[in-house]
């Protein structure tokens, strides 16, 4: 079945940001003892920023909940988890301390290593890729990946006040464009490439 021009364009963009191995059906349609698999997916409830019953919930407590539930649902011992990686963008230190604290709150041993990654708008996905790559290269056998953010406790505008930025940022188009909010960026991308919401939903 042929795809619409917009979906073809989305497929092209996908190839720019994903591994060729991920797109090769030779690797995805057959099973192998070397496959890296995701055995579960767990998330906490969500609420809008500064609203709802979770607006005062600490990120480390939310991570702890996910870690404990992961062990419980899959009948795993904490000591079998060799790596925990969480993505984060807004928190101080990119969530390093919160993830480490959550590890101990959930009764994981100190031998389980912890790392946080900061990649705007896809930090959680980057964490999943990092754990998968460690498994694929035989660095670890099992790990947990995720993402955490509290828009109620950490403002997107922290540190972006014009008076806090160097003048050189406003003299460089690429650097200046980094200040464009993601909502406007998505609108600009859709307009530039003629993408419609229906096509994006179908592709997703």
What are these regions (language model features)?
Residues 39-40, 87, 118:
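Residue-level detector of conserved, well-ordered beta-strand and adjacent loop positions
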């Amino acid at each position: 079945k042929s795809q619409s021009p917009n979906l073809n364009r989305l497929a092209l963009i996908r190839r720019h940001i994903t591994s060729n191995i991920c797109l090769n059906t030779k690797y995805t349609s057959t099973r192998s003892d070397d496959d890296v698999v995701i055995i579960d997916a767990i998330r906490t409830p969500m609420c809008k920023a500064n609203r709802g019953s979770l607006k005062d919930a600490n990120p480390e407590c939310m991570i702890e909940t996910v870690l404990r539930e992961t062990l419980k649902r899959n009948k795993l011992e904490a000591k079998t988890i060799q790596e925990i990686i969480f993505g984060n963008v807004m928190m101080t230190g990119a969530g390093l301390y919160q993830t480490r604290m959550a590890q101990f709150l959930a009764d994981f041993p100190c031998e389980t290593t912890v790392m946080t990654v900061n990649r705007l708008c896809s930090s959680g996905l980057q964490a999943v890729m990092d754990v998968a790559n460690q498994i694929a290269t035989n660095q670890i056998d099992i790990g947990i990946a995720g993402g955490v953010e509290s828009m109620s406790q950490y403002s997107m505008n922290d540190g972006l006040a014009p008076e806090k930025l160097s003048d050189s940022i406003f003299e460089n188009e690429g650097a200046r464009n980094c200040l464009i909010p993601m909502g406007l960026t998505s609108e600009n991308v859709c307009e530039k490439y003629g993408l419609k919401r229906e096509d994006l939903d179908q592709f997703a």
